[in-house]
Amino acid sequence: MNSNAAQTEQPMKHNGNRMTVKDFIILAKPGIIISNSLAALGGFWIAWIQSERTGGGPGIFAAMAVAMIGTALVMASSTVFNNFFDRGMDAKMARTRTRASVTGKIPPPVMILYGTCLGACGFIMLASLNVLTAVLGLLAFLLYAVVYTLWFKRHSVLSTFVGSFPGAAPPLIGYCALTGYIDMPAILLYAIMFLWQPPHFWAIGIRRKEEYRAAGIPLLPIIKGNRATKIKMLRYTAVLTAVSLLVPLYIDVSPFYTASALLLGAIWLYRSVKGFQAADDTQWSKGMFFYSIVYFSLLFLILMADSFINAVLRT
């Protein structure tokens, strides 16, 4: 790999258009923020159900909103700084070269100010809940915006693994926002999101392989090849399925959750195995990426609904 390819370059000149609200929203990567907010909601929800405070009143829902918004703002801040640092690499990729951060439509000083304001507001909100929640938010920010973005993404095939540590923080932050401590249910929620991320992002890596190669990003599909990546994806999916089946040991759910987790995991494992016979890796990886989103969304929704129904039936 060309070591100079990953270095930050001067972004392209902007086209003279004014900055818009839409530009700032896109800069914060709203798709990621929405998914992170929902994951934080899932963590808070499980903590609420586990604490048997289902009659907590408006205060609980206010805290839930603060946890979601605070997490969203901190993660948005980290993605803004990620876009700031990645301007040079993004200019080399077809799907990112028109971003306002690359064209110069949003100047670098404005990006820094924007990211700082988002982060400050988010940290204040998380700190208003408890110290642990704010610390977790800060660690997630530093790991993603600094450790992952500035070093591993540019220099190591381990970037996806390292990026999964801050990427899995939202449900943990949401859980601790209510409890103020980390226990086994919190660790399980974190582990599920952590193990979900590598196969999810490697599917993108296989599909966009040549774009990432042009940008000089040392992803696993580029360094080790598609087959080695598929083996890793299969392993992570197998471990994820096993971990998801540990949930009933620590969270009060019915056999419906267990059956659902087993079915969802089995489908993902089947699709992973089918990848070794795929005639078109790009098409296969597109399907894997889509299913990974379906898997995560359904697993968390079923977990939240099932635990709530169980709590209601206990009363």
Curated annotation (Swiss-Prot):
The places in or outside the cell where this protein is found are: Cell membrane
| One GO cellular component term | plasma membrane
Tell me one GO biological process term.
heme O biosynthetic process
Its UniProt entry gives the catalysed reaction(s) as:
heme b + (2E,6E)-farnesyl diphosphate + H2O = Fe(II)-heme o + diphosphate
InterPro entries named among the record's database cross-references: Protohaem_IX_farnesylTrfase (IPR006369), UbiA_prenyltransferase (IPR000537), UbiA_prenylTrfase_CS (IPR030470), UbiA_sf (IPR044878)
Alphabetically ordered keywords of this record: Cell membrane, Heme biosynthesis, Membrane, Transferase, Transmembrane, Transmembrane helix
On the tree of life, the source organism's domain of life is Bacteria
Q: Kindly give the membrane topology term recorded for this protein.
A: Multi-pass membrane protein
Which molecular function terms from Gene Ontology are attached? Answer: protoheme IX farnesyltransferase activity
Q: How does it assemble?
A: Interacts with CtaA.
* Sequence similarity: Belongs to the UbiA prenyltransferase family. Protoheme IX farnesyltransferase subfamily.
Q: What does this protein do?
A: Converts heme B (protoheme IX) to heme O by substitution of the vinyl group on carbon 2 of heme B porphyrin ring with a hydroxyethyl farnesyl side group.
Q: Which HAMAP family match?
A: CyoE_CtaB
PANTHER family annotated for this entry? PROTOHEME IX FARNESYLTRANSFERASE, MITOCHONDRIAL
Q: What is this protein called?
A: Protoheme IX farnesyltransferase 1
**Originating species:** Bacillus velezensis (strain DSM 23117 / BGSC 10A6 / LMG 26770 / FZB42) (Bacillus amyloliquefaciens subsp. plantarum)
The gene from which this protein is expressed is ctaB1
